[in-house]
Amino acid sequence: MKIMILGSGAREYSIALALRRVDKNLEFYFAPGNGATESLGTNLNLKDPVVLATYAKEKGFDLCIVGSESFLAEGVVDIFKQQGLAIFGPSKAAAMLETSKSFMKSFLKKYRIKTAKFLNTNDIEKAKNFIYSLTPPIVVKADGLCAGKGVIIAKTHEEAIEETAKMLSGESFGDAGKLVVIEEFLDGYELSIFAVCDGNDFVLLPAAQDHKKLLDNDQGPNTGGMGAYAPSSLANESLLRKVQKDIILPTLAGMKKEGAEFCGVLFIGAMIVGNKPYVLEFNVRFGDPECEVLMPLIEDPLELILAATQRRLRHSKIKIKKEFAVGVVCASENYPYKSSPKSEITVNNIPENSHISYAGVSLEDGKLMADGGRVLVCVGTGKSIEEAQKNAYKLCDNVNFKGKQYRKDIAHQVLK
């Protein structure tokens, strides 16, 4: 079976690793991939969705899995389907749940799904009036995709107005910020909840928790994510039932009414306030680093993806292992401020019940080099969260490159 995976991070690497676990004969092609994905398959220097679809058809690919949201925003799923190709991910219209925050918020309001009080606007005067109606802190979001960096939490009314003006002028995020979403701040705890959907039905995956801040104890600047763990004991059965009834089902029904059936991964960034789930954001693909801790917990991820793509989730028996996973991101020394010089990665040995998912790496003269940002993720699994964490950090100690930085407290929320 020939499978194309679109993206270049640890998320895409972890998907291939998980699929290889259930079928050693799979052939992988990554577009564009990274220096480590070459050890799992073939990297393709292709990015244009039309070119990718043509190539996939010519080479007789059986399945394409979209890892990165940028491909979804370009309508890669629609293009592949027009060619009669099997692809896992939502259409361009359905992907607007992530690619346009204003669309997402209006959708939530229309279908009465709990979310923070908000205003979508491109008018600074309307923005000011709404900002002064809120009690700080105040959340200001750029409408479009900003590589996970388009959200500001302002401590004062004045800061919120200043950040809104910078977005609307194009100074902060270019065209992505020329429409903004201003929100009340919700005070609770965040969970990442994933549902794999086929338009009508869904399979709920274990709830994960991401760690956005660079430093221990949730200090320092925001990042793309410094680690994750799953399942989270903070997501009790009662809460997950509410998420299914009050968020996932009305979202699938609503998207169908909008003429954009949702097939793929619905990633709910949820804020839990008094055991009630509110939608902070939707993403329409696996999170990174959450994907790296979810993949080891799915008994047969290939069957899950195929069942969703073929719209037969209702009849598919997807099993989740009774295990835990912890993923610790090792980042380059200057992350997230600026790029760092390349340096060779050495791995002394990989202990049992652990593995590495590679992201910001390149291959030079047969050597794997740390090449920017989040370099790799050390993943540990175990029968308890304590065991999984121990295995992840044992692996971390065996991985070295110049300036390696990582958090020492991943999963602290449930290990206090």
Curated annotation (Swiss-Prot):
Keywords: ATP-binding, Ligase, Magnesium, Manganese, Metal-binding, Nucleotide-binding, Purine biosynthesis. Belongs to the GARS family. ATP binds at residues 131-192. InterPro entries: ATP-grasp, ATP_grasp_subdomain_1, PreATP-grasp_dom_sf, PRibGlycinamid_synth_ATP-grasp, PRibGlycinamide_synth, PRibGlycinamide_synth_C-dom, PRibGlycinamide_synth_C_sf, PRibGlycinamide_synth_CS. Mg(2+) binds at residues 281, 283. Its cofactor is Mg(2+); Mn(2+). It comes from Campylobacter jejuni subsp. jejuni serotype O:2 (strain ATCC 700819 / NCTC 11168). PANTHER family: PHOSPHORIBOSYLAMINE--GLYCINE LIGASE (PTHR43472), PHOSPHORIBOSYLAMINE--GLYCINE LIGASE, CHLOROPLASTIC (PTHR43472:SF1). One of its GO terms (biological process) is purine nucleobase biosynthetic process. It comes from the Bacteria. Its EC number is 6.3.4.13. Pathway: Purine metabolism; IMP biosynthesis via de novo pathway; N(1)-(5-phospho-D-ribosyl)glycinamide from 5-phospho-alpha-D-ribose 1-diphosphate: step 2/2. SMART domains: GARS_A (SM01209), GARS_C (SM01210). This is Phosphoribosylamine--glycine ligase. It catalyses: 5-phospho-beta-D-ribosylamine + glycine + ATP = N(1)-(5-phospho-beta-D-ribosyl)glycinamide + ADP + phosphate + H(+). The keyword Magnesium applies. Binds 1 Mg(2+) or Mn(2+) ion per subunit. The gene is purD. The keyword ATP-binding applies. Pfam families: GARS_A, GARS_C, GARS_N. One of its GO terms (molecular function) is phosphoribosylamine-glycine ligase activity. Residues 105-310 form the ATP-grasp domain.
